[in-house]
């Protein structure tokens, strides 16, 4: 990418704000707002009529990596036609739909460690051979070139050593494939020392319990080549002994805890199997762990355990996985990724099915990664709570009280350390707070402080997932709270942060989740973003022409103001087919500012104000048509002509509704009632969006709609005051006002997200979308906004 620094467009003044990205600057070329955007080209427009100009439904070029090249080559077609891009997107969408529709209990990579535990099960008829020979075949076929087993693409000493030791045990137990076991033993001996310097964050789950058990079994088998007296092994044993003293056996036997997941690590303890068998899931597993279930079967020969083991082997072609089912985890994280990448609209029915499925297994204590686990974790519960609430489900926030202890929130019972991603997911969930939900306020404060502290100390590594850009994702999430998060800004940054298939999940070994970490998701998102971005760039071309022809600058509104207005529209309503809504959003914002500027200008006479209002009424009633400007009322005629052009671009029914909305706003403006611009914008957008089927005129008079309008107007008026102070370089923070805005935003979120009764959910969502743009403008630094404008509208996606 070319040298990036913040664009100083039209000498914009940059001031401090409560939320600001790192001091990254973007120097844009002249083409950012230059003449190239005003050029006409036969390649630029296709047959979409809007306001007597043509705006392309699908723009005919894709922005190049260099901004200068965009200037020079804007009229050149890309090497890859948009038809091919569309086909590629459609093919990938079809693939993802098939993936989501076949998600079943979740797609997860095979685990060498768990397969080895299955291989250790002796023949049920008493013969000296494995009960499941397919596991031995899998182990023999999947040894890596260096003699180890484990994740081939991401190296970690923990993952490789525990997988290799388990597989060596399986081969030596049945005295098969001696050359492979010898090679594995050599690997262990030569690489054991790497544990001394291995990153603790990459330690696999329960390693300090599981590795000693495997070592003991190896020693009992007479595998003497391993240096059992090595300092690192002694250290691991000491850690194990310390941890075992903190595991109360009475609790282990009484209720389902996270310890069950690594129960094979308790092999040498006095376990009461009669009590433990009561903690099985209905599927027969122990906390959805194949290895733990295999361990239990060795001691109990329980039929339900055997049924679960056979199910796993059948599902994964003779091998095992780290954890199964992962049906809830897979569905929730898949939905989250699709939403953040900005492509969820392609999978609405699949997402609906996923969330409906998750809700079926929701309990008052939350959920786990797999159904029927008799155990609940904060990570899945947080993700589930947020997504279900955002999709209209009635969710009780008191579910989080089960994870709170001594002022902190923990993922699993008995957790000794906090997880970065778990805390971040709780933080995201807490931002959907409704009024009076104190537990979510406590959660948000705890999470924000925890994450800020970790960020300040540059400790942004997680114990559950290894993701290349996780630290950047966390920082961006802290800097852009949900109230100020615009869909296209979020998608643009998440495209940078999402690693696709490069994500590695940490269980008792490393595993991959195709439903969650999928390169197809990213490919669709990149192609779609570029496609939409090209469309937005041509719309921006049109908007600049409109700016000139409408004499907007005469009302003190700069081209930069127009750019920000269009950006807010495009960052919120980004889909290619919604050109009309974006244009109307930007125009309505600018025209209302023009009229408001006219009304509040000291030089505007009462006669001129009356002339504007009378002219508008005459125009509505068909008694007057703008034909030419009278010199004594030049500004009045400019405003009437611009407003007439804006309202005349719709069919008769929509135009009638829009004229009424603008009449209401003008009346309020005349009466000195400030802050109704948000209501005007919402109503305009809902009419323009085609909600007129459900958007009957009587809806405007319904109490729910009035409540939403009044609340949105109040919020946006206060946010405008904050934004004006920011522009005027004043920094007199008003904590009382901030708290009032926070409370009102919570009330608005509640009204919008609760299940729709009288008003269509899409109509209500427009109120929140508009309010979020005001929140964004008030609390995000001007310098940061310029970076976002560049990234969303102009910077190519690489």
From Swiss-Prot:
EC class: lyase
Biological process per Gene Ontology, one example term: gibberellin biosynthetic process
Subcellular locations according to the entry: Plastid, Chloroplast
Classification via Pfam families: Terpene_synth
Documented EC number(s): 4.2.1.174
Pathway recorded for this protein: Secondary metabolite biosynthesis; terpenoid biosynthesis
Cofactor: Mg(2+)
Principal location class: plastid
Motif interval(s): DXDD motif: 377-380
Keyword entries, A-Z: Chloroplast, Isomerase, Lyase, Magnesium, Metal-binding, Plastid, Transit peptide
Protein name in the entry: Peregrinol diphosphate synthase TPS1, chloroplastic
């Amino acid at each position: 990418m070319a040298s990036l620094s913040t664009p100083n467009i039209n000498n914009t003044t940059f001031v401090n704000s409560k939320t600001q990205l790192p001091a990254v600057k973007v120097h844009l070329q002249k083409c950012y707002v230059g003449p190239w955007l005003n050029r006409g080209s036969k390649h630029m427009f296709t047959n979409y009529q809007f306001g007597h100009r043509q705006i392309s439904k699908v723009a005919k070029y894709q922005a190049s990596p260099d901004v200068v090249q965009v200037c020079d080559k804007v009229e050149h077609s890309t090497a890859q036609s948009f038809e091919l891009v569309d086909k590629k997107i459609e093919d990938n969408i079809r693939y993802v739909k098939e993936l989501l529709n076949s998600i079943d209990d979740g797609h997860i990579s095979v685990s060498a460690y768990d397969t080895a535990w299955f291989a250790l099960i002796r023949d049920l008829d008493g013969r000296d051979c494995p009960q499941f020979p397919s596991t031995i075949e899998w182990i023999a076929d999947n040894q890596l070139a260096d003699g180890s087993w484990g994740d081939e693409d991401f190296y970690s000493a923990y993952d490789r050593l525990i997988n290799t030791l388990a597989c060596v045990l399986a081969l030596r137990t049945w005295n098969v494939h001696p050359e492979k076991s010898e090679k594995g033993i050599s690997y262990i001996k030569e690489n054991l020392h790497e544990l001394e310097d291995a990153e603790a964050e990459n330690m696999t789950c329960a390693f300090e319990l599981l590795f000693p058990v495997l070592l003991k079994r190896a020693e009992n088998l007479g595998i003497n080549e391993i240096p059992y007296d090595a300092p690192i092994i002694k250290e691991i044993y000491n850690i194990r002994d310390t941890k075992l003293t903190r595991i109360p056996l009475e609790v282990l036997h009484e209720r389902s805890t996270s310890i069950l997941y690594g129960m094979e690590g308790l092999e040498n303890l006095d376990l009461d199997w009669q009590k433990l068998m009561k903690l099985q899931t209905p599927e027969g597993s122990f906390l959805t762990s194949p290895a733990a279930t295999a361990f239990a079967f060795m001691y109990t020969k329980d039929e339900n355990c055997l049924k679960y083991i056979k199910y796993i082997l059948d599902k994964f072609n003779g091998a095992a996985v780290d954890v199964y089912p992962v049906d809830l985890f897979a569905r929730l994280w898949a939905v989250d990724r699709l939403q953040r990448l900005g492509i969820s609209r392609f999978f609405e029915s699949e997402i609906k099915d996923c969330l409906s499925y998750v809700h079926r297994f929701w309990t008052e204590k939350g959920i786990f990664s797999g159904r029927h686990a008799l155990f609940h974790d904060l990570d899945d519960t947080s993700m589930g709570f947020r997504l279900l609430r955002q999709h209209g489900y009635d969710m009780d926030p008191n579910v989080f009280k089960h994870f709170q202890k001594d002022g902190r929130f923990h993922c699993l019972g008995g957790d000794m350390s906090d997880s970065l991603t778990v805390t971040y997911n709780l933080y995201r969930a807490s931002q959907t707070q409704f009024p009076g939900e104190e537990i979510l306020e406590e959660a948000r404060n705890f999470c924000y402080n925890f994450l800020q502290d970790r960020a300040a100390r540059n400790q942004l590594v997680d114990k559950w997932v290894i993701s290349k850009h996780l630290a950047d994702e966390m920082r961006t999430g802290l800097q852009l709270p949900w109230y100020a998060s615009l869909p296209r800004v979020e998608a643009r940054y998440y495209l940078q942060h999402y690693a696709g298939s490069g994500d590695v999940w940490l269980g008792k070994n490393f595993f991959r989740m195709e439903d969650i970490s999928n390169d197809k998701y990213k490919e669709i998102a990149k192609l779609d973003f570029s496609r939409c971005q090209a469309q937005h760039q041509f719309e921006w071309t049109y908007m600049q022409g409109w700016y000139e022809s409408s004499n907007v600058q005469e009302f003190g509104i700069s081209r930069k103001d127009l750019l920000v207005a269009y950006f807010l529209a495009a960052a919120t309503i980004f889909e290619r087919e919604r050109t009309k809504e974006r244009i109307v959003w930007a125009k309505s914002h600018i025209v209302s500012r023009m009229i408001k500027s006219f009304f509040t200008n000291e030089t505007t006479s009462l006669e001129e104000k009356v002339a504007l209002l009378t002219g508008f009424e005459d125009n509505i009633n068909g008694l007057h048509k703008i034909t030419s400007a009278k010199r004594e009322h030049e500004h009045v005629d400019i405003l009437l002509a611009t407003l007439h052009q804006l309202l005349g671009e719709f069919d008769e029914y929509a135009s009638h509704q829009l004229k009424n909305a603008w009449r209401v706003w003008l009346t309020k403006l005349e009466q000195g009632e400030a802050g109704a611009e948000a209501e005007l914008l919402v109503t305009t957008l809902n009419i323009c969006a085609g909600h007129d089927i459900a958007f009957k005129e009587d809806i405007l008079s319904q109490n729910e709609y009035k409540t939403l309008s009044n609340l949105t107007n109040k919020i946006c008026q206060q946010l405008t005051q904050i934004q004006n102070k920011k522009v005027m370089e004043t920094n007199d923070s008003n904590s009382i006002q901030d708290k009032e805005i926070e409370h009102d935003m919570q009330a608005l979120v509640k009204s919008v997200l609760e299940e729709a009764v009288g008003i269509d959910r899409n109509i209500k969502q427009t109120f929140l979308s508009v309010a979020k743009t005001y929140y964004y403008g008030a609390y995000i630094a001007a310098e940061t906004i310029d970076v976002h404008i560049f990234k969303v509208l102009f910077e190519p996606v690489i």
